Amino acid sequence: MAVTFSDLHTERGLKTLEEHLAGKTYISGDQLSVDDVKVYAAVLENPGDGFPNASKWYDSVASHLAKSFPGKADGVRVGGGVAPPSEAHPHTEEPAADGDGDDDDDIDLFADETEDEKKAAEEREAAKKDTKKTKESGKSSVLLEVKPWDDETDMKKLEEAVRSVQMPGLTWGASKLVPVGYGIKKLTIMMTIVDDLVSVDNLIEDHLTSEPNNEYIQSVDIVAFNKI
């Protein structure tokens, strides 16, 4: 019976592979078959010590594949999606995986991808892009100084006006009132932003010092700006 593996770039998928390989040397028995090559292609890297069965299997398949291609490799990197099968290598019928007299050299490395394999390849690419995007989306800690119009400005409402500004990637933090002189106080307030989502200049010009918040806020200055 055919076995289906999915999400082999995730811990859940590797756990399924680990359980399947318990007591087995290869995917479909004690001999390497095209099934192993297909699953191997869907695993991003050696699963590691957390998956001993899968890790041992991965190294074994890698060793067999290396022996199948004795030529010296300089090492290459391939970008983009999965390429369609080359016309120079037409699809051939896969031998039945009966385990009797199978030869590693007979494995068809150029067989057409199944729907599950295409889906797995797409999921791997999506996972890589999500990981890259997460790494690139840094955060910053910003300290703002918010000044009122005069000593008659209601500072409680001023702070409420500041915190009323909400947008994706913006989190308001601690604040305090600092005396300036002549009965006037200013508000200092911390905020954390996701750099790719929030522009501090836009936040100040288009939200904090524009209507209706400019009824309480005269100006806003950046006191400190630090990457997290």
From Swiss-Prot:
Disulfide bonds: none
Main location: membrane
Topology relative to the membrane: Peripheral membrane protein
Region (Disordered): 75-139
PROSITE patterns recorded: EF1BD_2
Presence of the UniProt keyword Membrane in the record: yes
Key words of the record: Acetylation, Cell membrane, Elongation factor, Membrane, Protein biosynthesis
Pfam families xref list: EF1_GNE
Entry's localization field: Cell membrane
Superkingdom as given in the UniProt entry: Eukaryota
GO cellular component: cytosol; eukaryotic translation elongation factor 1 complex; plasma membrane; plastid
Gene3D superfamilies with a match to the protein in the record: 1.20.1050.10, 3.30.70.60
Composition bias, Basic and acidic residues: 116-138
Residue positions where N-acetylalanine is found in the record: 2
Residue ranges of every copy of the GST C-terminal domain listed in the record: 14-65
Membership in a protein family: Belongs to the EF-1-beta/EF-1-delta family.
Protein name: Elongation factor 1-beta 1
